[in-house]
């Protein structure tokens, strides 16, 4: 299995990171993509990708951190993207829900990262929350210059899913879909997503699936729970889990690993 979204640099993993990776492997999660959310975190994610076999990383600035973008940011990301472990630009995009950075700052950092990804011919790992129309408006001019993109941790509506997929993007599905309180709309639209546009991720340590039984003592999510997400998604889509695993693994490899060096 391939977890395309793991926040490896989170301090929640500081005391047992090696053991967490070992639990993932024991559960059948052999490949992982570590998310970079700032320049510093992207550098750390790349270092962890060097350390763990079968793992890669992204390099980017999350919309929450867009206020930190300056003239040096693109140069530092460009240098980092030259590392063999870095296979995508991101996490980048727009988040108008909390606006930790202003919308103008977010839009500038997003556009500059799209420009960089186009220059380097790298796919993009995207974030969008409460900003769908503006997100697409900024993304559209770059689509024919990018080798691919995934909208990570998709939690939008069916209409938003259709508009996103019409542009050729992949959708990343997390344990959000296992939440009986807020994930039912996403669960209902799962069959709308073509299998060749679907990717799976935990977004660990966040979004622990709420329907795990028995429920873990800790609320911290881990990549070892990706098989549970896969099983549930396959059930709600009416597909064989083994087939869906092979399909989503192939999707991840096609998007991220076309030109990657073996990890």
UniProtKB/Swiss-Prot annotation:
Q: Which UniProt keywords apply?
A: Cytoplasm, Exonuclease, Hydrolase, Magnesium, Metal-binding, Nuclease
Record-listed E.C. numbers: 3.1.11.-, 3.1.13.-
Q: Where in the cell is it found?
A: Cytoplasm
**InterPro entries hit by this protein:** DNase_TatD-rel_CS, Exonuc_TatD, Metal_Hydrolase, TatD-like, TatD-type_Hydrolase
- Amino-acid positions noted as binding a divalent metal cation in the UniProt annotation, renumbered to this chain: 91, 127, 152
| Cofactor(s) of this protein | Mg(2+)
Query: GO CC terms for this protein?
Result: cytoplasm
Keyword set includes Chloroplast: no
Renumbered to this chain, the signal peptide range is none
Record bears the keyword Magnesium: yes
Q: Which Pfam families match?
A: TatD_DNase (PF01026)
EC class of the enzyme, as a word: hydrolase
Which GO terms label this protein's molecular function in UniProt? 3'-5'-RNA exonuclease activity; magnesium ion binding; single-stranded DNA 3'-5' DNA exonuclease activity
Q: State the family named in the UniProt similarity comment for this chain.
A: Belongs to the metallo-dependent hydrolases superfamily. TatD-type hydrolase family. TatD subfamily.
Biological function:
3'-5' exonuclease that prefers single-stranded DNA and RNA. May play a role in the H(2)O(2)-induced DNA damage repair.
- NCBIfam families per the record? PRK10425.1 (NF007745)
Give the multimer and partner information: Monomer.
**Record protein name field:** 3'-5' ssDNA/RNA exonuclease TatD
